[in-house]
Amino acid sequence: MKIAMLARNPNLYSHKRLVEAAEKRGHSLDILNTTRCTVNIASHRPTISYNGETIKGYDAVIPRIGASITNYGLAVLRQFEMAGVWPLNESVAIGRSRDKLRSMQILAKYGLGLPLTAYANDPKQAEEIIKAVNGPPVVIKLLEGTQGIGVVLAETMSSAKSVIEAFRGANVNILVQEFIKEAGGTDIRALVVGGKVVAAMKRTGAADDFRSNLHRGGSAQLIKITPEERSTAVRAAKHMGLNVCGVDMLRSNHGPVIMEVNSSPGLEGIEKATEKDIAGQIIDYIAANAKAGKTKTKGQG
């Protein structure tokens, strides 16, 4: 099987592991720098060029699109889809997952556990939305942020209002969420492949940091999740339409609450914490499911 991966950095652990796992199973996997792909739009002949040459012959594509090039990356992925190449995660599902508000709206629609969340455009409504999520304290997030960037814990009404006004003054969109104190600076990352949780880890934030992202200096360890947490992760992946994703949850007093569904989860932390060959499971899933022209939109919204 011939697989393409849309990614800018071939040296990332996740990307090297996917190449290794594919080659170990007798497949070829080419890493294509997303920004060097050119989309050629013509009736009945959707093509993609890479470094000036037309791309052809791929059975599947793995999108590992960086947040900073989401729109361009999704345009390239759509072109692969229109050419009949099977995507590990579809463009419409990735687009959903990159919009935190849209993700929350979809998950809420299906009754999945979420932290109290509010969204408003007018900074004059700051106090109203802080109270709507039982704050302060509150967590304020950029809609487009990743890896814990653009996430602020505001512990007083005045600091929360100041942060909201500053973000809105910079004309960026934000969510305001309740602070789940009982989580104690830890969260759970459940990795879903093909509708099953294949691995889970507990992430703990660095000292004096409520964010548990590994990119922010947090640590990870193996954890046994509850049946409710497993079901929550599987349902989140299903309703977001994602074949592979990382579902980040907090343990609250009223059960698991979803913080984010990541459509391009890193493999290093979870493979090392669990000692599982997750890259291999992803490649096996592709080999079992990739068929030419088998692209259809899943999920709602």
Swiss-Prot record:
It comes from the Bacteria. One of its GO terms (molecular function) is metal ion binding. Mn(2+) 2 binds at residues 260, 262. GO terms for biological process: protein modification process; SOS response; translation. Residues 104-287 form the ATP-grasp domain. Binds 2 magnesium or manganese ions per subunit. It is an enzyme of class 6 (ligase). Its EC number is 6.3.2.-. InterPro entries: ATP-grasp (IPR011761), ATP-grasp_RimK-type (IPR013651), ATP_grasp_subdomain_1 (IPR013815), RimK (IPR023533), Rimk_N (IPR041107), Rp_bS6_RimK/Lys_biosynth_LsyX (IPR004666). Belongs to the RimK family. This is Probable alpha-L-glutamate ligase.
